[in-house]
Amino acid sequence: MMHILVSNDDGYQAPGILALAEALSEMARVTVVAPERDRSGASNSLTLDYPLRVHGTGPHRYRVEGTPTDCVHLAITGLLSEEPDMVVSGINAGANMGDDVLYSGTVAAATEGRFLGLPAIAISLNAFEPRHLATAARVAQLIVQRLSRDPLPSDTILNINVPDLPWHEVQGWEATRLGRRHRAEPVVRDEDPRGRAIYWIGPPGSEEDAGPGTDFYAVRNGYVSVTPIQVDLTRYTALDQVAGWVSGLGRPAEEGH
């Protein structure tokens, strides 16, 4: 039977990860290794300056005093006696579309699985207070079934965003690219009880590139967005221009001391 590692960034008690683990347990052996608290926005950060503590919360269930990336790294490289066959991260409360993927701990957990050589999926539901986790859980089951039967190229991470709708209202599936947001809103300044300035990170920018073909457009129109992403961030279309730009910087070895 397939063995799936489940993680997230909302914490081990979040409704989304509980729904995901339950759904995938119907088709695979599931091990959950997740942060002990909400680590949304942790991105791909690894904890390097202090040891990680792990606490068992039930059979094949662990909470980690660390980031989502810590959880997956720890699970695959030392915690588990048997390496899983796949990593599934989610179900996140709130979409991870466009630029969101650079900050998302949900996507980061999947990315770490891909770094370590495993098929990886990140699943998010387009609502901060989800009403239809069952829809996203069913999406997870179908995607896992399909991926196990028909693997994708080894450098591919699937970023799945699901509209917060009853299953019978979902319009279908769309392969999409990442959209883009406008610049983030300003930070919010406040004061602590002693009158010292404190700051809250402001909300993300509104949708900018959100037309047909994007993840934003698909979810807005009731479709499940399936975006293949990868770790390589190189902008290949700019390489020739940058090569010419760099050539104008000179050659230090020919300039002497």
UniProtKB/Swiss-Prot annotation:
One Pfam family linked to the record: SurE
Binding site for a divalent metal cation: 9-10, 40, 92
Cofactor: a divalent metal cation
Molecular-function annotations in GO: 3'-nucleotidase activity; 5'-nucleotidase activity; exopolyphosphatase activity; metal ion binding; nucleotide binding
CC annotations in GO: cytoplasm
PANTHER family: 5'-NUCLEOTIDASE SURE, 5'_3'-NUCLEOTIDASE SURE
Family membership: Belongs to the SurE nucleotidase family.
Protein name in UniProt: 5'-nucleotidase SurE
Record organism: Alkalilimnicola ehrlichii (strain ATCC BAA-1101 / DSM 17681 / MLHE-1)
